[in-house]
Design a protein with these regions (language model features):
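Serine-esterase "nucleophile elbow" of acetyl-processing enzymes
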Residues: 1-60, 70-77, 81, 155, ...
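Alpha-helical cap/lid subdomain in secreted, periplasmic
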Residues: 38, 62-187
Length: 188
């Protein structure tokens, strides 16, 4: 049996923009499990508000690097880690930039490669929606964050190329919800 760890934020967790959590079969991890079949075990490690490596002053314990190594160790042996972080790194109080976020995610990928000794699939986050100003998250994600979300995919594709790992741009396969402009619409 192959073991795949999905390490991410609220979009991995399955956060529903109107509140709650998508059921197992609706979250991307559940869809992946169904598509791959019984020879694969999908391990879901999605945490709302998780950052790649930044300490959130309003939501402590969300720094993705802090729990990464224990998480990898607890799920060994792994055949693949799917890493989808970066959305929360765009919060205004982190003084975000494409370079800063890409650099942070490069370090996360390097840590995964070193600790798990298994491949990493780096997934760029979805775009932040154009109606973010009307969202409950508007104070954390100003227009500059929306611009970063549209540039991040290219920078992360370059990170993946440099690390010789596969890459997927989630913004090319799903959209932000109209409800909050941050979380993905249902994957089904």
């Amino acid at each position: 049996m192959k073991h795949i760890l999905c390490y991410g934020d609220s979009n991995t967790h399955g956060y529903i923009p109107s509140g709650g959590r998508y059921d197992d079969d609706t979250r991307y991890t559940g869809i992946l499990a169904k598509l791959l079949g019984s020879d694969y075990r999908i391990i879901e490690e999605g945490l709302n508000s998780r950052t790649s490596s930044f300490d959130d002053p309003f939501e402590p314990y969300k720094n993705g690097m802090d729990c990464l190594v224990p998480c990898l160790d607890s799920h060994k042996p792994l055949d693949l880690t799917i890493l989808m972080l970066g959305s929360n790194d765009m919060k205004v109080y982190f003084s975000p930039s494409v370079e800063k976020i890409a650099g942070s995610l490069a370090k996360v990928c390097q840590t995964i490669l070193m600790v798990s000794e298994a491949p990493v699939l780096l997934v760029s986050p979805i775009y932040l929606g154009d109606n973010m100003a009307d969202s409950d998250f508007a104070a954390s994600f100003p227009p500059s964050s929306i611009a970063i979300s549209h540039e991040l995919g290219g920078a992360l594709e370059e990170v993946a190329r440099q690390l010789d790992i596969p890459f997927l741009d989630a913004a090319k396969v799903t959209l932000p919800s109209k409800e909050d402009s941050l979380h993905s619409v249902s994957y089904t």
